Regions:
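A conserved catalytic-core segment of Leloir-type glycosyltransferases
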Residues: 8-81
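Acceptor-binding helix/loop patch of EC 2.4 sugar-transfer enzymes
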Residues: 35, 44-56, 109-156
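Short N-terminal targeting/anchoring amphipathic segment
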Residues: 71-92, 105-112
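Nucleotide-sugar donor-binding and catalytic loop/hinge architecture
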Residues: 204-221, 252
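Conserved donor-binding/catalytic core segment of Leloir-type glycosyltransferases
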Residues: 215-234, 240-244
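A short, active-site helix/loop in glycosyltransferases that binds the activated sugar's phosphate group
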Residues: 118-123, 143-191, 196-206
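N-terminal subdomain of nucleotide-sugar transferases
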Residues: 1-31, 103-106, 187, 241-251
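Nucleotide-activated donor-binding/catalytic signature segment of Leloir-type glycosyltransferases, i.e.
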Residues: 250-282
């Protein structure tokens, strides 16, 4: 989305990814190899070991101990500005990020979760240890004073010392949390909401849209979406509770309502709603 917008404004831009899912020539995939698969597996093995060989939150944390050195790639050497996004699970290691910093190129890092300014977690929940020093991580099976969250936090702190990175949050909420972290203290932290291509996403004829999506014409529809509906952080439980309150307080009105849900595992919640649910199965 950002790349296309930049290109439309006359700026040359390329997107470097671990796994390419488009045929656009401006999207460049890292070279396929079994080494990439092993990097992903090895990071999980290290986390699994640090987690006392428990699967607890095995994919909820990342330590960035494996990755690819991109600084020798032509896409990197030709670039004037490096814009990082979500770089985990074998894309870039902390060592690779250090190489990027040492290149001297201006760096912008758009944060899509909390990982850039915490030890190992993507969402800290009620934990605020990232504000000073991660340790006794609640997302580990048995955290300790110098657990893997502590050690990764220390590595990141050394990594960011002397670096000049502009951290961009996609929401004011994430910006406010980032500014609390001692990890990126002194760095530029700002907020730029996710852009929307209004040439593509724009008001259209409602009747035609419902026909195309096989949705009823005679109901008022609520829309809820998440990559994984069962992820408690996304708020599906709040929506179910609110819908039940509506059905209880306004039984006649609730007959006119329906819920459109896009995201994985939407069908699991169908029986919990007091009125029809229409899974889009994104």
């Amino acid at each position: 989305r950002l790349m296309e917008s930049l290109k439309n404004h006359g700026i040359k831009a390329k997107l470097l990814v671990r796994d390419k899912q488009t045929d656009q020539i401006s999207v460049v995939e890292l070279k396929k190899s079994w080494w990439k698969v092993w990097q992903f597996i090895w990071e999980r093995v290290v986390i699994w070991q640090a987690n006392h060989f428990k699967k607890h939150n095995l994919f909820a944390v990342d330590i960035a101990n494996t990755g690819t050195n991109i600084t020798a790639l032509p896409e990197f050497t030709q670039a004037d500005v490096i814009h990082l996004h979500w770089i985990n699970q074998g894309m870039l290691s902390l060592t690779d990020i250090r190489r990027i910093i040492q290149s001297g190129k201006p760096i912008v890092w758009t944060m899509h979760d909390m990982w850039p300014f915490t030890g190992i977690c993507h969402y800290a929940g009620d934990c605020d240890k990232y504000a000073t020093q991660c340790h006794n991580c609640p997302q580990l099976y048995k955290g300790s004073r110098k657990d893997i969250a502590y050690r990764t936090f220390q590595k990141k702190k050394k990594l960011f010392e002397g670096a000049q990175i502009t951290f961009v949050a996609c929401s004011r909420w994430l910006e406010s949390l980032a500014k609390k972290s001692d990890l990126i203290k002194g760095q530029t932290i700002t907020n730029i909401p996710n852009a929307i291509n209004t040439n593509l996403f724009k008001p259209r004829d409602k009747k035609q849209a419902r026909e195309k999506c096989h949705l009823p014409q005679d109901k008022k529809l609520l829309l809820f979406g998440s990559v994984k509906i069962t992820d408690k952080r996304k708020g599906i439980d709040y929506l179910v509770s609110a819908c039940k309150q509506i059905a209880s307080s306004y039984p006649d009105f609730s007959k006119e309502l329906g819920v459109v849900v896009f995201g994985n595992q939407a069908e699991q919640y169908a029986s919990l709603f007091p009125f029809p649910i229409y899974p889009m199965n994104y």
